[in-house]
Each structure stands twice: as C-alpha cells, then as structure tokens.
Amino acid sequence: MRVAVIGAGVIGLSTALCIHERYHPAQPLHMKIYADRFTPFTTSDVAAGLWQPYLSDPSNPQEAEWNQQTFDHLQSCLHSPNAEKMGLALISGYNLFRDEVPDPFWKSTVLGFRKLTPSELDMFPDYSYGWFNTSLLLEGKSYLSWLTERLTERGVKFIHRKVASFEEVVRGGVDVIINCTGVWAGALQADASLQPGRGQIIQVEAPWIKHFILTHDPSLGIYNSPYIIPGSKTVTLGGVFQLGNWSELNSVHDHNTIWKSCCQLEPTLKNARIMGELTGFRPVRPQVRLERERLRFGSSSAEVIHNYGHGGYGLTIHWGCAMEAANLFGKILEEKNLSRMPPSHL
C-alpha cells in the first residue's frame, strides 16, 4: 500500500511512525513523507516542549483523552535509553495568576499538582494565586531528529518538496494521504476556521533557571503574558500570540515586550546571554481536525486522513492524535480487506 504523509512537524512524523509500527509488519507500506520544511525549520522546532494543555476544557472531549494518552506514552519512555535523544525529561514549575481560578482538567494527569503556599507566592509579588506541579519536557528539535531517525531505519522515504494540491498526489497513485500540514492546511483544502497564531520566543543561556514559570492574564489571552521554560541547553522566554499574523520576521517590538516582562518576572535573567530568537505559527482551530475523507479526481481516488489544527499544544497532544489516525488507517485497511493486523502494543 502506498502512503503519502504531507508535513514533517511533530504531528506528521509521529503519525507516520505510529502507523508504520502498527501496520507495516502485516501489510507492507510504501511510505513517503513530503514537506518543504524539515527540522530544524518547522513550527515544532520553535516549541519549548512543556507538556501542558490549555487551562480551559477542550470543546471536543476527545482532545482531553488524546492529551492523556500522550502524557502516558511519554511517561512510559521517560526511563528508556531513548529518553535523552528524544529530548524527554521531567520538569517542575509554577503557573501564576492574579486571581483565584478553577483547577485545570489535567490536574490529575501531571505529578504532584498543588496550590502554591503564601511563602511561594512571596517570590512572585505581582501574582496572588498559583499552582505547582511536575510535568514532562519534550524538546521539539531533539524529538523531531529522533523521529526522523526511527522512520529512516524503517525505510520511510523523505521527499523535500512542497505539495501544491491533493490532486497531484492522488493522480500519482497513492492509496492513502495523511494530511499533517498544520497552519498551511488551507493551501490544500479551504478551511475558514484555521488561522495562524504567531509566536515569538527568545532563547537565552541561563543554567541557573531550573523551573518553568507560566503566567496567565485572561485580559490578554493565552500566551500573551510572560513565560519562562528551561530546556537542556537554553531557556525559552515568551510570549506572544497574534491571531492572523503571517509575519515570519522577528519583531523588535515583540522582543522588547518579551524581554522586559520576563526580566520583571525573573530579574536574574537580566544577566543572561541571548542565544537566539525564533518566530513560528501555531495552527489555531476551534477543534483539532482528525477525520477521514475520500477524494476523487477523474478516475483516480484516495483516502485522506486529516490531522491538523493543534494550536499551541501539538507536542502535548501529538501521540494521542497519532494513535487515533492509526485507528482510522486500520479501518481503511479493513474496508480494503487488507487487515491481518497484529494487536497494537503502543
């Protein structure tokens, strides 16, 4: 069976690996991954990689399940020999608010969730309420490299080319297309509900920062208040969230806003050396689009599995979505009478 995966961010690569691991042993798959951007030039490479969903309940309850499945999968990998190459580690830190808020739906997923004590809040004089918990860090650049290695070992081919239309892929004789094009999905099929959520980050050298610090201001919206997330080599400072802004240029205004607010939150950052600055686009949509569609162009047709629209939480939800996409792929095989599938061990 010929499979074309379009998109090489965390969603595309993880979905490709999940499908190939589950079905290739019983039904040989000739899989190619098409993209005009590979690591380190994808949106996933810009992500700091903290596992944390949005604070509000998802409009699609299934997304909460996909978040949980991703956490469980990553936690099972935490002590494996692959963890370091994956960019996977435990990380603890703070969520800060100016007013009391309800506990998040994911509080029982993360480890050691609790409310901050008065003495802890004294460290953050601009905030009066907060949580502390331990979560997972999955650094995008390391993880994409690891996924690429796993897929290459399995014989999956990578094609550095922009796909202009579904029609060109279908007419090329592909049986199944996996559409993981993220914020650019609208170029292949119109989707009025998909928008870019532009983000900009500063990476600094600050090895003394050990905990993440996320602040929340409902009046500014998600990702528009300062956050600090330490990684294995650098610390990520953010953030901005600009809906509908397609500018890939780093903004001096946004840089100054991020730097000033993060240094106010953690004054020791004033001594940190700036290592880099990146801009990326979150694929914002009211809900993740994860569904099947059959496309026909003349006498040629193919099944398409859409998997995009993960907003700013692609790394948080990716493996649950990959497993669901693999389930849809299995149904396609069943309908084609090709399913001699072994039980999943994922």
UniProtKB/Swiss-Prot annotation:
Name of this chain's protein: D-amino-acid oxidase
Function: Catalyzes the oxidative deamination of D-amino acids with broad substrate specificity. Required to catabolize D-amino acids synthesized endogenously, of gastrointestinal bacterial origin or obtained from the diet, and to use these as nutrients. Regulates the level of D-amino acid neurotransmitters in the brain, such as D-serine, a co-agonist of N-methyl D-aspartate (NMDA) receptors, and may modulate synaptic transmission. Catalyzes the first step of the racemization of D-DOPA to L-DOPA, for possible use in an alternative dopamine biosynthesis pathway.
Record's comment on post-translational modification: Phosphorylated in the cerebellum; probably not by PRKACA, PRKCA or PRKCE.
Residue ranges of the region described as Required for protein stability: 1-16
UniProt activity-regulation remark: Inhibited by benzoate, anthranilate and luvadaxistat. Inhibited by 3-hydroxyquinolin-2(1h)-one, 4-hydroxy-6-[2-(7-hydroxy-2-oxo-4-phenyl-2h-chromen-6- Yl)ethyl]pyridazin-3(2h)-one and 3-(7-hydroxy-2-oxo-4-phenyl-2h-chromen-6-Yl)propanoic acid.
Induction note: Increased in pups born to mothers fed D-alanine during pregnancy and suckling; not induced when mothers fed D-aspartate. Not induced further in the cerebellum following two weeks of intraperitoneal injections of the antipsychotic haloperidol.
Tissue specificity comment: Expressed in the cerebellum, liver and proximal tubules of the renal cortex (at protein level). Absent from spleen (at protein level).
Location(s) in or outside the cell: Peroxisome matrix; Cytoplasm, Cytosol; Presynaptic active zone; Secreted
Region annotation Active site lid that may open upon substrate/product migration in and out of the active site and close to increase the hydrophobicity of the active site, to make the hydride transfer reaction more efficient: where it falls in the sequence: 215-227
Binding site for FAD: 8-11, 36-37, 42-44, 48-50, 162-163, 181, 282, 311-312, 314-316
Gene name, Swiss-Prot/TrEMBL: Dao
Binding site for D-proline: Y227, R282, G312
GO annotation terms (biological process): D-alanine catabolic process; D-amino acid catabolic process; D-serine catabolic process; D-serine metabolic process; digestion; dopamine biosynthetic process; killing by host of symbiont cells; L-leucine metabolic process
Cofactors: FAD
Subunit comment: Monomer. Interacts with BSN (via coiled region); the interaction is direct and inhibits DAO enzyme activity.
Family: Belongs to the DAMOX/DASOX family.
Primary localisation category: other
InterPro entries in UniProt: D-amino_acid_oxidase_CS (IPR006181), DAO (IPR023209), FAD-dep_OxRdtase (IPR006076)
Molecular function terms from GO: D-amino-acid dehydrogenase activity; D-amino-acid oxidase activity; FAD binding; glycine oxidase activity; identical protein binding
Reactions catalysed, as given in the entry: a D-alpha-amino acid + O2 + H2O = a 2-oxocarboxylate + H2O2 + NH4(+); D-alanine + O2 + H2O = pyruvate + H2O2 + NH4(+); D-cysteine + O2 + H2O = 2-oxo-3-sulfanylpropanoate + H2O2 + NH4(+); D-dopa + O2 + H2O = 3-(3,4-dihydroxyphenyl)pyruvate + H2O2 + NH4(+)
Provenance organism: Rattus norvegicus
Biotechnology: In comparison to human DAO, has relatively poor activity on D-serine and other substrates, raising doubts regarding the use of rat as a model system for testing drugs against schizophrenia or amyotrophic lateral sclerosis.
A Pfam family per the record: DAO
GO cellular component terms listed in the entry, alphabetical order: cell projection; cytoplasm; cytosol; extracellular space; mitochondrial outer membrane; peroxisomal matrix; peroxisome; presynaptic active zone
Enzyme class: oxidoreductase
Keywords from the UniProt entry: Cell projection, Cytoplasm, FAD, Flavoprotein, Oxidoreductase, Peroxisome, Phosphoprotein, S-nitrosylation, Secreted, Synapse
Residue sites binding D-serine per the record: Y223, Y227, R282, G312
EC number, as in UniProt: 1.4.3.3
